[in-house]
Amino acid sequence: MDSAVTAVLAGKYPAKQHARRVAEALKASGHDGSGVIYLEGTKTRMAEDSDEAVPFRQRRNFYYLSGCELADSYVTYNIDQDELVLYIPAADPDEVMWTGLPLSPEEALKKYDVDKVLASSEINAHLAHYCTNKETAPKRVYAIPDRVCAETTFLPFDDTNWDALSNALNQCRKVKDDYEIALLKRSNEISALAHLAVMKAAKLAKNERELEAVFRSTCLSHGSRGQSYGPIVAAGVNGATLHYQTNDMDLEDPVTGERPSLLVDAGGEYRLYCSDITRAYPLSGKFSVEARQIYDIVLDMQTQCMDMIKPGVAWDDIHARAHKVAISGLLRLGILRGSEEELFEKRISVAFFPHGLGHYMGMDTHDVGGNPNHADPNPMFRYLRLRGTLSPSEVVTVEPGVYFCRFIIEPYLSSPELGKYIDSAVLDKYWKVGGVRIEDNLVITQDGYLNLTTAPKDPEEVERIVQQG
């Protein structure tokens, strides 16, 4: 693990800095920069007909202003007084026997970057306390609709603004500070180790689920207690399903003994910060001719797109470059027919590369602030989760792919207008490839990018790793 990352993470999560940034964003959006910001953490919720709690997932906006993973908590930021207050559950004698003593306010004050820690039960009293002096009382509270429990009251305030806070948080969360980048780096470090472990286990594995278990256990053993999303472990034709989740197919043909290629899209989560990495490689240790041809196209797509990345560049243009590289490669193989210009104009490559090139990443895998337009009439951009130009300290994924999904491609083949651009006889050799995707996580720098992802992707190297086991 990177010692520089460890040194950064030895400090507190910069919640106070984040609160100030959000206050500045509110002011920049036309508000007077006065008032109280209010956020709630996730509530404990019981499973139906059970005394077990459902798996807990902290609200990301709450964590951004607190650094706290405790359930049933609150945070307020008095903009005028520059005071950040965390409210955590008090000890419940009936629960101590089962779960031990909770974090005390004194311990929480040492752990978190806040000015004061109170009990969750004091939230209404403290909100009212802010308004006791009418001359200095904040007039407004900023909150998020449907994120305020029935027990909380804002009656002491003259006004409640339900519109501005979510947008301000989204704008701030797009741009990562050094601490957040260190968290994302650590998440990537752990996930790279897990991807490497899966590569080494691939040759002898019998079923997709075994390799999912290898990934999860490697992450957990290195401090990543959760996954950023459900791991995708897709062998052969399963790789044509973008978010395949079954992970339960045997890895060897019972008749021929052949082992297909594997696509693994998985990322551990470290202290709520994600990674999102995809690698593809042959389970036998040697790519088939067709699989290697597609792999080389996808790697070229990623390389050319990454060469374009720097502040001020439009993500739409980088995404379009990926399609142009895909068209060139598929023409070279004979899968496509026609001119590159006509194929691009007709959006034929969407049949083989239907998703967006990438997205913002942070506390959510598909992080906030991307401004997607799923109603875009242009099919090439409809599923692009990031629209706009890149800026320093944003974190993006770059994940081109080429897929052979019958559900998507066959309507093109049957179309009188579009079918002529695809050679079905050549295409038949590639259905078994399924899909290839290569995905890295990049921080935008002042003049380019920093690649956080270190998992091997050179085709000869991944073959060697699988062969050696």
Swiss-Prot record:
Binding residue positions for Mn(2+) 1: D276, E399, E439
SUPFAM superfamilies: Creatinase/aminopeptidase (SSF55920), Creatinase/prolidase N-terminal domain (SSF53092)
Cysteines joined through disulfide linkages: none
Superkingdom of origin organism: Eukaryota
Molecular function terms, GO-annotated: manganese ion binding; metalloaminopeptidase activity
Sorted UniProt keywords: Aminopeptidase, Hydrolase, Manganese, Metal-binding, Metalloprotease, Protease
Catalysed reactions listed for this entry: Release of any N-terminal amino acid, including proline, that is linked to proline, even from a dipeptide or tripeptide
Keyword set includes Secreted: no
Top enzyme category: hydrolase
SMART domains the record matches: AMP_N
Record-given protein name: Probable Xaa-Pro aminopeptidase PEPP
Record CDD domains: Prolidase
Residues bound to Mn(2+) 2: D265, D276, E439
Family designation: Belongs to the peptidase M24B family.
Coiled coil ranges: none
Function of the protein: Catalyzes the removal of a penultimate prolyl residue from the N-termini of peptides.
Cofactor: Mn(2+)
Cofactor binding mode and count: Binds 2 manganese ions per subunit.
